[in-house]
Amino acid sequence: MTNLNYQQTHFVMSAPDIRHLPSDTGIEVAFAGRSNAGKSSALNTLTNQKSLARTSKTPGRTQLINLFEVADGKRLVDLPGYGYAEVPEEMKRKWQRALGEYLEKRQSLQGLVVLMDIRHPLKDLDQQMIEWAVDSNIAVLVLLTKADKLASGARKAQLNMVREAVLAFNGDVQVETFSSLKKQGVDKLRQKLDTWFNEMQPVEETQDGE
């Protein structure tokens, strides 16, 4: 199995919705999570780049899909954070529709990393994301972020509780703890991404370029 060099990951483009994304080919792994789940920090830690994904001071403001290329035909996709209280209701609904559309229609999307604050896991929208992914036969890795905020015993208890809870989804859902601050769980994240990028079947370009 090829170990990819995530430090070579580079920004490709931002898109407001699925229609503005590049052609639906290769393999994409998306990162999703609530606005304060530490998604940007996880991407920066994974790639060992301090500012690959911008950490926003105003959560919920950047409603764009950001694409990064790890290697030819292998992309990481940073989906906008969801569930931020101060975003207008209409914008929330619009974004949830766009998220659902991306998860259901994007053929090259083959893995989903759902990030949740270990202290507040499995909120309604987190469960919705996992459900969408499982319904679309997309493998899921749940990362319980900010794991350094809990003592070892509490951390294990949360991990076991979430692992138990996701069994109800009846899908390919793995759960691990993660800390950007302590670099904990980074190896497991890289291993999972390597597995997905190496073993999933890339989507080929069709005749009409669709």
UniProtKB/Swiss-Prot annotation:
Coiled coil (UniProt feature): none
- List the PROSITE patterns: G_ENGB (PS51706)
Q: Can you cite a GO biological process for this protein?
A: division septum assembly
Q: Where is the EngB-type G domain?
A: 25-199
Its Gene Ontology cellular component terms are: cytosol
Keywords (A to Z) from UniProt: Cell cycle, Cell division, GTP-binding, Magnesium, Metal-binding, Nucleotide-binding, Septation
The residues that the entry says bind Mg(2+) are 40, 62
List the cofactors.
Mg(2+)
Q: Name one Pfam family in it.
A: MMR_HSR1
Gene Ontology molecular function terms on file? GTP binding; metal ion binding
Q: Where are the transmembrane segments?
A: none
Question: Has UniProt tagged this entry with the keyword Acyltransferase?
Answer: no
Nucleotide-binding among keywords: yes
Q: Where does GTP bind?
A: 33-40, 60-64, 78-81, 145-148, 178-180
Q: Which InterPro entries match?
A: G_ENGB_dom, GTP-bd, GTP-bd_ribosome_bio_YsxC, P-loop_NTPase
Alphabetical list of NCBIfam families matching this protein: GTPase_YsxC
Query: Which family, according to UniProt?
Result: Belongs to the TRAFAC class TrmE-Era-EngA-EngB-Septin-like GTPase superfamily. EngB GTPase family.
Described purpose of this protein according to its UniProt entry? Necessary for normal cell division and for the maintenance of normal septation.
Name of the protein this chain belongs to: Probable GTP-binding protein EngB
Q: Which species is this record about? A: Escherichia coli O157:H7
